Amino acid sequence: LNIKVLKKTSDELRIEIEGEGHTFCNVLQRALLEDETVEMAGYNISHPLVANPVVYVRMKEGRKPEKKPETALREAAAKIKLQTKQFRTSLEKALKEWQQK
């Protein structure tokens, strides 16, 4: 997974994620928007066959605590990782219960 930083300020971050699509970016966007310090999060894929998604994050002005957009991205990635682990655990439990029927 290659990531290229396209723009970085104290309030904004724009990155390009090579080889990803709507599936990953949609999950990332949702996790970012659950952060109260994030004003806007979105992504754009200019052409689904030849373009990489560009993810954009803008933080709220006067946010407390002061958080950088890269910190919000790191926290969103950690949240996605935890949710994936919880999903796997729940799936394994459900499959085991199904087999015992």
Protein language model annotation of sequence segments:
Residues 1-101:
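Protein-protein interaction/assembly regions in multi-subunit complexes
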